[in-house]
């Protein structure tokens, strides 16, 4: 401080934690079980990862599905498609089957999912209002030559 140091902080929130919608997960698990057998379906439940899908799950019913067929570290330089049939074809069949399940019977399953518990934010405007509130910059320490001020 004696040399006139200042500390300026810029705080920007990262991605939100992913929260897979429970109702959508139940429908997807049922569809996947019919497609590949229930013994091949894992419901990982809640995870600690934060991702752009986490942001979406704040305002929309969301589900981040992982389908086998690759090996290596996700997003790593050793990530490779090792089973194109499972990775590409089974994945596409799963997505289409899930859409069909949600839309059949006048979209009964989709309506049930949409009637689930409240989301973290009622709409995207409320979400962005919070993000803007967290996104800020300020001088944490300011020294005017005689005194230092610390702001929290």
Regions found by a protein language model. Name each.
Residues 1-152:
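Metal-dependent amide/peptide-bond hydrolase catalytic core
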């Amino acid at each position: 401080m004696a040399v006139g140091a200042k500390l300026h902080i810029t705080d920007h929130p990262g991605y939100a934690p992913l929260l897979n919608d429970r109702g959508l997960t139940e429908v997807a698990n049922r569809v996947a079980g019919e497609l590949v057998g229930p013994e091949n379906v894992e419901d990982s439940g809640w995870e600690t990862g934060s991702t752009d899908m986490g942001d979406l799950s704040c305002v929309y019913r969301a589900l981040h599905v992982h389908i086998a067929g690759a090996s290596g570290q996700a997003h790593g330089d050793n990530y490779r498609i090792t089973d194109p049939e499972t990775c590409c074809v089974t994945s596409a069949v799963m997505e289409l089957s899930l859409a069909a399940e949600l839309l059949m019977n006048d979209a009964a399953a989709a309506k049930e999912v949409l009637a689930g518990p409240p989301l973290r934010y009622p709409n995207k405007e409320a979400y962005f209002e919070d993000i803007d509130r967290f996104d800020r910059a300020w001088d944490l320490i300011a020294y005017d030559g005689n005194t230092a001020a610390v702001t929290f």
